[in-house]
Amino acid sequence: MSLFRTYARVLTYLNKEKNASLLICSANVMLAIITIAEPILFGHVIDSIAEKSAIIPTLTIWVCFGISHILAYVLIARGADRLVHRRRLAVLTESFERIIAMPLIWHQQRGTSNALHILLRAVDSMATIWLDFMRQHLSTLVALFVLIPIAFNMNWRLSIVLVVLAIIYVLIARLVMRKTKDGQAAVECYHHNLFQHVSDSISNVSIVQSYNRIKEETSILHQHTNDLLKAQNPVLNWWALASGLNRMASTISIVCVLLLGAFFVAKGQLRVGEVVSFVGFAQLMISRLDQMSNFINLTISSQAKLQEFFAMEDSTFQSKEPENLPSLQNVKGAIQFHHVTYKFPNSSQGIFDISFEVKTGQTVAIVGPTGAGKTTLINLLQRIYDPTLGHISIDGINIRSVNRESLRKSLATVFQDAGLFNRTIHDNISIGRTTATNEELYEAAKIAAAHDFILKKTDRYNTMIGEQGSQLSGGEKQRLAIARAVLKNAPILILDEATSALDVETEARVKDALDCISHNRTTFIIAHRLSTVRNADLVLFLEQGHLIEKGSFQELIAKGGRFYKLLKAGSLAINQPTIETKDENVIPLHEAIAS
C-alpha cells in the first residue's frame, strides 16, 4: 500500500463525523488564507514608516488580524481535539468488538497480545494523523497553492527562489522516503518482538520467579531493545540529515531573497516594504514546507503499523458472518454430526469424518488419549471453529445457517480452564445470565458447591478475584465456572473436564448437582472417570482425530476394542467419588446480599 493510500484510508475513519470534520477543516483553510495577509500588512506598515505616512489605520488592521487569528486558532484546535478523541475511542471500541468476535483460530494464528499491540499503536497513530490533518495538513496544502500565485504576482523573479526551495524540499523528502521504507518496517517488527516478550514474561511471572529467570528475561529484553535501536538509528539519521538539508536550503533561500531584494531596491524597482512582505512570504512558505516534511515523516513512521492494522481489520470483515441470519429458537437438543472434518492450519492434527447422533436429553461421554480431538469436537459444536467438510445440526438445523449469538445462547460450557475475569465473584457468575436475580445467582452458586466458600470471603459476592482468578484456588475457580453454566440454564450442557480441579469430596457434591441439572438436558462430557463413562447414554472413543468406537458403555466393553483396552490399561480413573454427610453451619442466602 502506497503512502498516499495509507493516508487516505486513515482519513476514511473520520467519515462517521464527516460534517464536523469538514467544518473544522474549512475553518482552518480560511484561517490559512487569512494568515497570508499578515506579511502584506506588515510590508505596508514598513512602507508607511519609510514614507512617513499615516501608520495607525494599517497597524490597527494588522493587530485585529493577529488577535482574530489567535482566537480562531484556539477555537479550531479545541474542536479538532475533541473530535479526534471521540473518534479515537470509537475506532478502538469498534475494532475491539470485531476482534473479540473472531474465531479462536484467528486469535491463535495472530496471538492475543500481538493483536492488542497492533490495535493500540495504530489507533494512537491515526489520532495523531487526524489531528495534524485538521490543524495543519489541509490548510498547509491550500496555503502553498495560494502563496505561490500571490508571490508571483508580487515579484516573479523573487518567486523563482521560493519555487526552487519547494522543489528541493520535495526531492529531499522522496530521497528519505526511499531510504527509510525498509528500515521503518524492520523497526515495527522489532517493536512487536519487544512487546511480545514483555507480555509473555509478565503473564508467566510465577514461572519466571520460580525458576529464577528474572535476570535472563531482562537480558533478553535488553537484546530486543538493542535490536530495535540498531534498526531505528539509521532511520533517525536519515531524517536528521533531511532536517539539516531543509534548514540549509531555507536559510540560503532567505539570504537570496534579501540579496535580490536589496539589489532591486537599489535600482528603484522595489520598495523596502515589498521586500519585507516577500521575506514574510518566504518565511511563511518555509514553515508550511516544514509542516509538510513533518507530515511525511509522521506518515512514513506510522505506515508499517497502520498497514498491519488495516490487514487485521480486513480479516475481521472477511470473517464476519452474514447479516440477517435467522436465530436458533426453541432448542430441544437433538444433535447430529454429519461426516465432520476439521484440520488445523499448517498441522496434521484435527478431527476426520466424524459422524454420530445424539437424542434429546442424552448424556455423551467423549473419551480418548491426549490430542485425540475431544476439545476440538466440542469447539466445533460451539462454532469456535467451523468444519472444513461436513456439517453439524441441532434439531435438524445446520448450525452454520443460524447466527452464532443464538447458537451460543443454547449452550452452557464449563471449560477445563475456568476462564475468569478480573472482576467480582458476582460479575463472573452473572456472565451466565446477566438478567438473573440475586436469588437465582446464589442458588446457582449453591448447586455448584460454591456458595459456602464465597461467604467466607471478606466481601463475599463482591470479592475481586484478581487476574485469571489469581485470588482463588483451582477448585474455587472451577466451581465459579460451573455456577456460571448452571445460571445460564441452557438446553445443551458441555463439560470440558469440568471437575478436574476439584477434590474428591467437592467433586461428589458437584457431580450430584451436575447430574441434577443435566437431567433431560443434552450433555457432552469430556470424561476421565469411569463413573462418568458408565452412566453416559453414549460413549465416543476418539484417537488421533478419528472416531474409533461409539456405543453404550456395556456395548464397548463387550466389543473388546480400543475402549476396553483403555480401561484395562487404567487410563480412566476407577474411583467413584463419595461424600460423607456432615452438619455444616451454612450462612443463609439473604446474608450474602452485598451491602
UniProtKB/Swiss-Prot annotation:
Superkingdom of origin organism: Bacteria
GO cellular component annotations of the record: plasma membrane
Domain ABC transmembrane type-1: 21-301
GO molecular function: ABC-type beta-glucan transporter activity; ABC-type oligopeptide transporter activity; ATP binding; ATP hydrolysis activity
SUPFAM superfamilies: ABC transporter transmembrane region, P-loop containing nucleoside triphosphate hydrolases
Domain ABC transporter: 335-569
Enzyme Commission code: 7.5.2.3
Swiss-Prot/TrEMBL keywords: ATP-binding, Cell inner membrane, Cell membrane, Membrane, Nucleotide-binding, Sugar transport, Translocase, Transmembrane, Transmembrane helix, Transport
Pfam families: ABC_membrane, ABC_tran
Region forming the signal peptide: none
Binding-site list for ATP: G368, P369, T370, G371, A372, G373, K374, T375
Keyword check for Lyase: no
Membrane topology reported for the UniProt record: Multi-pass membrane protein
Catalysed transformations (reactions): [(1->2)-beta-D-glucosyl](n)(in) + ATP + H2O = [(1->2)-beta-D-glucosyl](n)(out) + ADP + phosphate + H(+)
CDD domains referenced in this protein's UniProt entry, alphabetically: ABC_6TM_NdvA_beta-glucan_exporter_like (cd18562)
TM region(s), chain numbering: 22-42, 55-75, 129-149, 152-172, 248-268
Localization of this protein: Cell inner membrane
Keyword check for Repressor: no
Chief location bin: membrane
Record-stated family: Belongs to the ABC transporter superfamily. Beta-(1-->2)glucan exporter (TC 3.A.1.108.1) family.
Protein role: Involved in beta-(1-->2)glucan export. Transmembrane domains (TMD) form a pore in the inner membrane and the ATP-binding domain (NBD) is responsible for energy generation.
Summary of subunit composition and partner proteins: Homodimer.
Domain notes: In NdvA the ATP-binding domain (NBD) and the transmembrane domain (TMD) are fused.
Protein name (Swiss-Prot/TrEMBL): Beta-(1-->2)glucan export ATP-binding/permease protein NdvA
Organism expressing this protein natively: Bartonella henselae (strain ATCC 49882 / DSM 28221 / CCUG 30454 / Houston 1) (Rochalimaea henselae)
Taxonomy of the source species: Bacteria, Pseudomonadati, Pseudomonadota, Alphaproteobacteria, Hyphomicrobiales
Gene this protein is translated from: ndvA
